[in-house]
């Protein structure tokens, strides 16, 4: 290859490298201030750094004794496979050992991921069930969704939502009207906004702390489908 051709090749390669670097810089500049998108969480380390985070229970449904010493806040998505894994593998023991015994109250807050197409409507449906039957019925509806869904996108057919309401002896016409009207759209969106504020960027994300009069706890963060032992260690420490 002649010297002239070598120069041309080097110039082309140099231009390509510079162009690639420029594109990368532009992309990083564009995305550096954007919040991370919510994701499904596999089992990860129990917390970010162990430092408590202030998190509110808001006005969301409570399972267990409202005067329990410990509050567990659960930010979840009804179509998240790791949320379902928590529901099947960890939640039953948590409920038996801590919630049913009055030591812990669990507050469920919605974090439907935008790539789970039915998750938002399922969250609103559970709120419509709560409107008729209170927190007890809310968690019955919650349990039915997690039991029936295949999770992760395919999920639960929306036609099943009023059927679950009927099975729970709710007024199906009132339920459907509530769901169709989007009555609880803002409620779900507020949960999403609050989740972002406390760094709950994936599902499930939990916060455990001592209960307070105003409902704002200093919560230790647990991320992902953790085993029962991860929850037990934090709860037992908080109960001392």
Model-derived regions: residue spans:
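A short beta-strand-turn-helix
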Residues: 53-70
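Short extracytoplasmic/periplasmic juxtamembrane "stem" segments immediately C-terminal to an N-terminal membrane anchor
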Residues: 35-53, 57
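C-terminal cap of thioredoxin/glutaredoxin-like
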Residues: 1-42, 162-240
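Residue-level detector of conserved, well-ordered beta-strand and adjacent loop positions
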Residues: 64, 73, 223
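A generic local structural motif
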Residues: 57-61, 91-93, 192-193
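Structural alpha/beta surface segment adjacent to cysteine/selenocysteine redox centers
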Residues: 68, 73-79, 84-166, 171, ...
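Conserved short-loop catalytic and cofactor-binding motifs
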Residues: 60, 113, 149, 176, ...
């Amino acid at each position: 290859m002649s010297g002239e051709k070598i120069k041309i090749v080097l110039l082309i390669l140099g231009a390509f490298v510079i162009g690639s670097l420029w594109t990368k810089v532009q992309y990083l500049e564009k995305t550096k201030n954007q919040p991370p998108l919510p994701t499904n969480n596999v089992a990860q380390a129990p917390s970010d750094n162990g430092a408590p985070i202030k998190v509110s229970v808001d006005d969301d449904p409570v399972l267990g004794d409202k005067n329990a010493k410990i509050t567990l806040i659960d930010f979840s998505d009804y179509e998240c496979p790791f949320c379902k894994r928590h529901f099947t593998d960890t939640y039953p023991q948590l409920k038996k050992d801590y919630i049913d015994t009055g030591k812990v109250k669990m507050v469920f807050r919605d974090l439907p991921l935008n790539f789970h197409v039915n998750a938002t409507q399922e969250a609103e449906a559970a709120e419509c069930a709560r409107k008729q039957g209170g927190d007890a019925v809310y968690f019955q509806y919650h349990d039915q969704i997690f039991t029936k869904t295949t999770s992760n996108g395919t999920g639960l057919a929306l036609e099943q939502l009023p059927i679950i309401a009927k099975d729970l002896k709710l007024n199906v016409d009132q339920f459907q009207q509530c769901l169709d009207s989007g009555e609880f759209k803002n409620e779900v969106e507020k949960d999403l906004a609050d989740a972002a504020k406390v760094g709950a960027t994936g599902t499930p994300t939990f916060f455990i702390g001592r209960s307070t009069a105003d409902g704002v706890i200093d919560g230790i963060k647990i991320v992902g489908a953790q085993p029962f032992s991860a929850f037990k260690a934090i709860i037992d420490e908080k109960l001392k």
